């Protein structure tokens, strides 16, 4: 049986999916607040930079591991403000997170042109060559089989479609790296306990960040899935990186 990491523990693929689903079910109600607290609000700036990689909003966009909908709703608002005709599909494997995304969309009056699909990133229920853009933010490291998810991204994109991924990465050497590691492993789980009542969930999230491949290694994985013109841009000295590629 194939094994992968759930944080620092070795589990089989099916077990990881169940455990990850439990993590996000347990923290769903505090998810947005925790993102603000953990990143000191920086995640909003990272996401603003991320959506700049989508210049054409008259498009079919698939947002995978959509979570509470931050990326898709930013794109929907931008399209509405510009008068663009965007079609957005939000996909996530967790029902509670999708429910929160729907509620936010209704509250922001952005529900029009949005579709919501409960699905795994490694087994998307969409036809080949369906989307102009595939976006995934802070989600791919939680997928049990990352290579399979990348191949699925390639499959559902149209020719010349663009893959864009925002993910935690490897901080460059220096004082920031040491502080970041201390903060991540010692402070964030304590915040998770105080705010979300779940220290273990945030221990997993930090461990998953620590184990995620470096920028260059992930770039190779994207290329091996079939993509071309694969690039990345570090943000905040490499705390996160935006990866982009094309299906040609």
UniProtKB/Swiss-Prot annotation:
EC category: transferase
Stored CDD domains: AdoMet_MTases (cd02440)
A single MF term (Gene Ontology): demethylmenaquinone methyltransferase activity
EC number(s) per entry: 2.1.1.163, 2.1.1.201
Entry keyword Methyltransferase: yes
GO biological process: aerobic respiration; menaquinone biosynthetic process; methylation
Pfam families for this protein: Ubie_methyltran
Residues reported in the UniProt entry to bind S-adenosyl-L-methionine: 68, 92
Domain of life: Bacteria
Name of the molecule in the record: Ubiquinone/menaquinone biosynthesis C-methyltransferase UbiE
Organism: Rickettsia canadensis (strain McKiel)
């Amino acid at each position: 049986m194939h094994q992968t990491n759930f944080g620092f523990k070795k589990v089989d693929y099916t077990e990881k999916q169940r455990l990850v689903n439990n993590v996000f079910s347990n923290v769903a109600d505090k998810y947005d607040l925790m993102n603000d607290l953990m990143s000191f609000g920086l995640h909003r700036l990272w996401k603003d930079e991320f959506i700049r990689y989508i210049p054409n909003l008259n498009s079919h966009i698939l947002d995978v591991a959509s979570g509470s909908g931050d990326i898709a709703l930013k794109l929907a608002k931008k399209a509405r403000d510009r008068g663009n005709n965007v079609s957005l599909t939000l996909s996530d494997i967790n029902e509670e997170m999708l429910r929160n995304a729907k509620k936010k969309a209704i509250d922001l009056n952005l529900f029009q042109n949005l579709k919501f699909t409960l699905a795994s990133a490694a087994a998307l229920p969409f036809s080949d060559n369906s989307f102009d853009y595939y976006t995934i933010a802070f989600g791919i490291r939680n997928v049990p089989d990352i290579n399979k998810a990348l191949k699925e991204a390639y499959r559902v994109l149209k020719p010349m479609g663009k893959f864009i991924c925002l993910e935690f990465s490897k901080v460059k050497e220096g004082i920031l790296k040491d502080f970041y590691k201390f903060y991540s492993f010692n402070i964030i789980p304590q915040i998770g306990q105080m705010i979300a009542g779940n220290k273990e969930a945030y221990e997993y999230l930090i461990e998953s960040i620590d184990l995620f491949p470096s920028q260059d290694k992930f770039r190779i994985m994207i290329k091996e899935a079939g993509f071309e013109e694969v690039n990345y841009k570090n943000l905040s000295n490499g705390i996160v990186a935006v990866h982009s590629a094309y299906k040609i």
